Structure formats: structure tokens, C-alpha cells
């Protein structure tokens, strides 16, 4: 990289970003996913001051150096896209080269098996690119625990190729908890952070309403992951990768082996930017 690279993942709730210094080479431990950036952060994009904060941080990171190339995924719509464009202009002027990534039928050695490849959520596609880039030749169950929880399947193909097979989408843990509180008369409202006791319990049920809600929502999430993992594992070795803002809450509830990564979408953007 002759110039820095800025990676931006605009999700439904938060904007996550990572800054890769020019000339830095990603180092991977054998069989593990790297985190090939030197600075990273996140803002809640519904916060009125979020874009000003982002612009100030990026301006400081650049300093007197060259303008970065920018790679972005966005699932939050055109309004936030315009706000991010304005923040980038505030940080770098109009000199930044910005790539708004879209889903496609293939990228490198990964082929999309989606019925309509361009209709696949770009976050799911790019996250799969990132995982496959560093774990070629492996069948992967990629779990992203965010506003929605997505399960995406990449199967190993001959010659190190990969195929995105499809996946599942279900309400995220926070959405499940909020739906119960909103649509019932007497059940309390819980946050994702309130599920820790249920996740640590040796029993899959609870003796109080608070923990019963947490245990039920965790069981729904974990059950989808474990069922999919078992189905894939019947065909051959499968690695489960867990990412997203609620990954730590889900981690305590899973009964299958998994590996965590901070942000697979940013990892996929890095793979595309450095291809």
C-alpha cells in the first residue's frame, strides 16, 4: 500500500472503521484470522455528533500524510451514506478515492451461490470474502451477531476455491429481548449485557423471569448456530467464526467450537483493498 487505507463498515446501528498504515503487512498466525489494522473505532451513527467525531479522528490520523483510499460497505441506506461522504470531505477534502462496495457474483477465489448475487447483503458477502481470504480450503460457518444475527456458509471447493452457499437471518439478541418487552404486558426489558448470568448457568432453564427471558433468547440464537454447524459437520470439518457486537454474549451460550474475530466485514474490505 503506497497510501493508508481506511475501511468503513456501516451497519444498522453502528459505523465501525479501521485504519491501515501505508506499508504495513498483515501478519497471520497459521490457521488464524489476523487483525491487519493499526487503529480502529466505532460510532453510533444515530448520534447527532457521530460524524463530526469521526471526521476529527480521521483528520488526526492522517496528519500531514497522504489521503487514504477508502473502502466502504453500507447496509443502513442512502441517508447515512450521504453523512459519511460529508464526514470524509470534512476530514480529507475531496481528494479521497472512495469505493462503495457492492455484492457480486464472485471475488477472487470465492463464488457466490446466492440465487441473485447482487441481492445478498453486502456485509454478508464481504465478511465471507474476509474469512475465505485467510482460511482458503476450509468450510466455514460465519456468524455475525449484530442488530440481526446472520449465519453464512462458505464451502471448500477444489483448488482452494470457495463457494458462498447462502445462510440464515434471524433477529439479533437485542431485537429478541426488545420484542418481548414491547409486545407483552408484564415481561421486563433486558439488555444484551443482562444475559451473562443465563449464559454462565449450567442449566438451560431459569427459576426467575429475568433469567428465563435471557436463557430463552440465548437458546434461540445458539440453537440456530449449533443446528447449522452439526448439519455442516456431517459433511466434513467445519470452522465456526463468531463476530459482531453481541458475539461475547453468544459465546457463553454455544456448545460447539468457535473462534472470535473483531470484525469480519472490515477484514473482507482489507482483502479487497489489498488484492
Swiss-Prot record:
Enzyme class: transferase
The UniProt record lists the keyword Phosphoprotein: no
Free-text remark on how the cofactor is bound: A monovalent cation. Ammonium or potassium.
Similarity comment: family membership: Belongs to the type III pantothenate kinase family.
Biological role: Catalyzes the phosphorylation of pantothenate (Pan), the first step in CoA biosynthesis.
Pathway(s) annotated for this protein in UniProt: Cofactor biosynthesis; coenzyme A biosynthesis; CoA from (R)-pantothenate: step 1/5
Protein name: Type III pantothenate kinase
Gene Ontology biological-process annotations: coenzyme A biosynthetic process
InterPro entries to which the protein is assigned, alphabetical: ATPase_NBD, Type_III_PanK
UniProt cross-references to HAMAP family, sorted A to Z: Pantothen_kinase_3
Amino acid at each position: 500500500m503506497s497510501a493508508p487505507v481506511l475501511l468503513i463498515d456501516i451497519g444498522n446501528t453502528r459505523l465501525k472503521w479501521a485504519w491501515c498504515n501505508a506499508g504495513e503487512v498483515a501478519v497471520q498466525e497459521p490457521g488464524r484470522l489476523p487483525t491487519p489494522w493499526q487503529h480502529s473505532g466505532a460510532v453510533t451513527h444515530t448520534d447527532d455528533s457521530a460524524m463530526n467525531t469521526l471526521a476529527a479522528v480521521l483528520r488526526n490520523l492522517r496528519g500531514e500524510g497522504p489521503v487514504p483510499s477508502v473502502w466502504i460497505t453500507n447496509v443502513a441506506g442512502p441517508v447515512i451514506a450521504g453523512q459519511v461522504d460529508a464526514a470524509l470531505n470534512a476530514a480529507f477534502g475531496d481528494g479521497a478515492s472512495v469505493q462503495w462496495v457492492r455484492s457480486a457474483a464472485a471475488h477472487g477465489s470465492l463464488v457466490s451461490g446466492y440465487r441473485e448475487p447482487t441481492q445478498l447483503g453486502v456485509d454478508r458477502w464481504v465478511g465471507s470474502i474476509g474469512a475465505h481470504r485467510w482460511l482458503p480450503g476450509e468450510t466455514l460457518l460465519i456468524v455475525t451477531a449484530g442488530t440481526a444475527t446472520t449465519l453464512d456458509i462458505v464451502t471448500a471447493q477444489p483448488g482452494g476455491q470457495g463457494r458462498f452457499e447462502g445462510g440464515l437471518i434471524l433477529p439479533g439478541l437485542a431485537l429478541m429481548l426488545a420484542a418481548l418487552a414491547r409486545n407483552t404486558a408484564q415481561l421486563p426489558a433486558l439488555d444484551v449485557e443482562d444475559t451473562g448470568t443465563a449464559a454462565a448457568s449450567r442449566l438451560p432453564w431459569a427459576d426467575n423471569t429475568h433469567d428465563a427471558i435471557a436463557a430463552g433468547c440465548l437458546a434461540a440464537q445458539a440453537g440456530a448456530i449449533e443446528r447449522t454447524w452439526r448439519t455442516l459437520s456431517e459433511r466434513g470439518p467445519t470452522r465456526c467464526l463468531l463476530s459482531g457486537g453481541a458475539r461475547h454474549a453468544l459465546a457463553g451460550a454455544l456448545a460447539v467450537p468457535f473462534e472470535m474475530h473483531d470484525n469480519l466485514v472490515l477484514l473482507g474490505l482489507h482483502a479487497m483493498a489489498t488484492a
